[in-house]
Structures are given as C-alpha cells and as structure tokens.
Amino acid sequence: MSFRDLRNFTEMMRALGYPRHISMENFRTPNFGLVSEVLLWLVKRYEPQTDIPSDIETEQDRVFFIKAIAQFMATKAHIKLNTKKLYQADGYAVKELLKITSVLYNAMKTKGMEGSNVGEEDISKFKFDLGSKIADLKAARQLASEITAKGASLYDLLGKEVELRELRTEAIARPLEINETEKVMRIAIKDLLAQVQKTKDLLNNVASDEANLEAKIEKRKLELERNRKRLQTLQSVRPAFMDEYEKVEEDLQKQYDVYLEKFRNLAYLEQQLEDHHRMEQERFEEAENTLRLMQNKLKEEEKRLLKSGSNDDSDIDIQEDDESDSELEDRRMSKPRTAMEVLMQGRPSKRIVGAMQGGDSDEDEDSEDSEIDMEDDEEDDDDLEDESIALSPAKPSRRIRKPEPLDESDNDF
C-alpha cells in the first residue's frame, strides 16, 4: 500500500459521492466492515438492481460475501479482483478497490455527468442499508463511552498540570552533571556488554550441544541397527524346545478332547439319573395314592358289611365261646396273603400273585359268617392301616367276603 494509492482512493470515493468520509487512517489496521460497505456501495453504483447479501457476522458469511462481489465484478464489469487481499481489509485491499473506483471515476469524467452526480448524491444520502447503520450505531455508542472515559481522565490530568509544570520546569532548568551521566552510561554499556557476552556463550553452547546431540543420535542409530539385526537373527533361528513344545501341545489338545467327551457323557448320565429318580418318585406317589384310595374303599366296604352283618346277626343265636374262638382262628387263616396284589394291578412291571382261601365246607362257611363279631372287625381295621403304611410288596390285604345268604340258618338250631 502506498500513500498515493490511498489518497487517490479517498478522492475518487468522495468524487463518486460516497456518503461517509474515508480517512487515510482507516486502512492502517484491518477494517472489514468498512471494506464490505464500500464494496456493496460500489456494486450498487454499478448495478442498482443487483441483490448481494450484506450479512458479514460470521467467517463463512464474509467469505461468501467476498466471493459474490468478485464473481459479480468478473461477469458484469470484467474486473478481476484478488479475494485474498479483499478479505484482509487493510492497505492491500485499497489496490483492489481502486480497480472498481477507477472504472467508475473514468466513466463519470468522460461522460460529463457532474450535474447528474450531484442529484445522485442527494438521492444516495437517503438510500442506505439499515443493517450497516445499526452496526454504525453500535460503534458510535461504544465510541461515545470511550470518549467519556478518556475525557474524564484528561480532565484529571489537566487538573494536575500546575504541579507537573513546576516539576517539569525544575527538571529542565537543572544542569546535568557530566560525571554522573558518564557513570550511568558506563553502567548501561557494561550491562549491554554482559548481555552480549551471555548471548555469545549461549550460541557457543548451542553449537557444542548440537554436536553432542548429533553424536548421541548417531550412537543410538548404530545401537538400533545392531538390535534390529539381532532380532532378525533370533527370529530366523528355530528354538530347540519348539519340537517338544509342539508335541506337548498336541498331547494337551488330545487330553482336552477326551476331557470334553467324558464331561458330556457325565452330564448326560446325570440327566438320565435325574429323570429315573423323578419317574420312580412319580410311581411311588401314584402307588401311594392308589393304596390310599383302596384303603378308603375297603373301610367303606367294611362299614357297609358291618352294618349288614349286624342286621343279620339279630336273627342268629350266638354259639359257645370256645367254638367262636376256633372259628375266629380259621377266619384269620383264610384271609388274603398280600395287599399289593390288589393295589398294584395297574402297574405293568408287577405281577399279581395271591390266592383266596375259603372254608372246607358249607358248614364252616355258615359258621364263619355267623360268628363274626365287632372285635374281629376292629382288629381287621387296625391290621389294614398298619399294612398300608409299610408299603411293602408282601404285606397282606384284608379282603372281606360278603356273607352268603343264610338259607340254612334255621337248621343250626
């Protein structure tokens, strides 16, 4: 950026009717807001009907704005702009802005549109972008607050000017002592020389340190190369224990396979054993339930027979005590041997073996039927309950024979 370019740019913008005053100090530092406003104004001046977004809040928006301006000027005015310099928004952007302003300025001069330009200036004063004005308003408020703070500090400093003037006058009027000044200068020179010597020592140390580091690096490289060769040698040589290791590994794999097979067999056999125990338990419970049902049926049958026997005994005379005892012994001997033969009839694995022993003659049967008393019935009930609890395959069952019709009961007398 040159002073002449900046001056020409400000004069051209003033001649073109730019509403704001552009100072040569505006481009000392990057000022993207001013550059974007100038570019938008120049584009509107070149093509009033164009529509270019003026949002420059984010970095992406600024890049899009610069690209849109450059594309518009390249297609409409055949002016090639450097987008990088425009994005810098400093003195280098002025050269790119001059490309546009020079075209518009030359066109204004050649066609002699001074009068119309004055009218356009008046119109352009009222045509402004509201967004840019809001940004200017924020900047103006910030500047107003800064001006207030600086004005207060300036007022305080001006209040101290009287005292400071006297001190300043005394300092200026006081003669300088040459010896003291030389002493201070010598001290300063010594300090500078010490700093220079220290810097030189550091540079020398840097050179020696660099040589030492290079030697260490070279040594490390040699060690690395040596270790790499050693590693390759070790990898290429087969260890002596590898054959034995592979053999042991194969044996271990075989033992593991055998272990897996035996473990599966053991698990299967345990499952079968559990199933067998469960089936036995179910059979036992079924037999117990069947025995309980048969016991209940036998009790009901005995009660019914006792009731019918008591009714029949009312018509029959009781014989002598010794005969009744002998007949009682014969009746006990004539009972069935086992009770499981009746209870386990539904089970296919059990065979029912038993015999019903009757009397030797009709006379014995008649006497047996007539001599049943209540004591014998109670003993039979007790024996049946004891045998049902034992659940042994050979326990006797008490089957009660129904009394035959007493056709010859009158002949006993």
From Swiss-Prot:
It is found in: Cell projection, Cilium; Nucleus. Residues 312-328, 360-388 have a biased composition (Acidic residues). Disruption phenotype: E9.5 embryos are still viable but die thereafter. Mutant embryos are runted, have exhibit enlarged pericardial sacs, and defects in neural tube development. There is a complete absence of cilia in E9.5 embryos. Sonic hedgehog (SHH) signaling is severely disrupted with down-regulation of PTCH1 and GLI1. Pfam families: Cluap1. The keyword Transferase does not apply. GO terms for biological process: axoneme assembly; cilium assembly; floor plate formation; heart looping; intraciliary anterograde transport; intraciliary transport; left/right pattern formation; neural tube closure. Keywords: Cell projection, Cilium, Cilium biogenesis/degradation, Coiled coil, Nucleus, Phosphoprotein. GO terms for cellular component: actin cytoskeleton; centrosome; ciliary base; ciliary tip; cilium; intraciliary transport particle A; intraciliary transport particle B; nucleoplasm. Residues 185-308 form a coiled coil. Expressed in all tissues tested including heart, kidney, skeletal muscle, eye, liver, ovary, oviduct, testes, lung and brain. Elevated levels in multiciliated cells such as the bronchioles of the lungs, ependymal cells of the brain and cells with a single primary cilia of heart and kidney. The modification Phosphoserine is found at residues 314, 324, 326, 409. Residues 303-413 are annotated as: Disordered. Belongs to the CLUAP1 family. Required for cilia biogenesis. Appears to function within the multiple intraflagellar transport complex B (IFT-B). Key regulator of hedgehog signaling. Interacts with CLU/clusterin. Interacts with UBXN10; the interaction is direct. This is Clusterin-associated protein 1. It comes from Mus musculus. The gene is Cluap1.
